């Protein structure tokens, strides 16, 4: 396809199956970038200029009730392609929020599922909203809802599949979530360092997943910071990211 001119550099390569947490996604800039790609069915997408990545969670009951959560903003680690921070609510205009949430509802209804579905989107430099991926399950982008929303995504999922009235999707307060992942060059029995330095900070809510072993970039937990000042919450999240170390026992 490249030799025929049907695909040009740069582009995004995605494995058709078994992609998660940044795995199975690569930015390809030249022929050298093709050398280490997996030999599998794949999707190739044009690399576009974007200014933000967004997510909207939608809940659907069998009886037809549908509710969306307010749109959130996702910030990704440039090296691992993993979500690093979630900002709730997204720092975009009200017009764009309405547009994103309406689009997510339309997409969710077309899947005809019962449960919850996260619709991930790109916000382009021209303020276009494009669908990136969908995930029909509880999603990392809404883990903050445990503390930050009237109804967590996990409770909402149970309400939806049991065909119970859906809970309020309104946010309780501004939140920033930071993912905790395994350090580079660390593989083995996990050890968490410096938690004592952050658990006393007001508004900090840690969640450890109980995984026995760590490896580079493996999601081991997350921390949600609740604060009326979302910029302050983001600064605290960055401090936590620099302080907490997830490594292996010596």
Predicted regions and their residues:
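Peripheral (often C-terminal) accessory segments that flank ATP-dependent C-N-forming ligase machineries
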Residues: 159-250
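A conserved helix-loop-beta module that forms one wall/lid of the active-site cleft
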Residues: 1-25, 31
């Amino acid at each position: 396809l490249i030799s025929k001119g049907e695909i040009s550099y740069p582009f995004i390569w995605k494995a058709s199956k078994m992609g998660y947490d940044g795995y199975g996604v690569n930015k390809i800039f030249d022929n050298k970038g093709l050398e280490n790609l997996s030999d599998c069915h794949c999707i190739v997408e044009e690399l576009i200029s974007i200014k933000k990545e967004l997510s909207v969670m939608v809940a659907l009951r069998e009886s037809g009730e549908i509710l969306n959560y307010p749109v959130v903003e996702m910030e990704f680690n440039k090296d691992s392609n993993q979500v690093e921070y979630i900002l709730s609510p997204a720092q975009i205009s009200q017009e764009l929020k309405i547009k994103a949430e309406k689009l997510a509802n339309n997409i969710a209804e077309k899947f005809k599922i019962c449960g919850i579905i996260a619709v991930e989107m790109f916000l382009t430099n021209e303020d276009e909203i494009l669908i990136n991926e969908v995930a029909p399950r509880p999603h990392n982008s809404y883990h903050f809802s445990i503390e930050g929303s009237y109804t967590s995504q996990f409770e909402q999922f149970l309400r939806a599949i049991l065909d119970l009235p859906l809970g309020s999707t309104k946010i309780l307060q501004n939140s920033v979530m930071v993912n905790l992942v395994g350090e580079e060059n660390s593989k083995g029995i996990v050890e968490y360092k410096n938690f004592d330095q952050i658990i006393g900070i007001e508004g900090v809510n840690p969640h450890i997943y109980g995984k026995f072993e760590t490896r580079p970039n493996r999601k081991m937990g997350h921390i949600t910071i609740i604060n009326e000042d979302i910029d302050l919450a983001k600064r605290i999240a960055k401090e936590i990211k620099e302080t907490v170390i997830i490594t292996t026992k010596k």
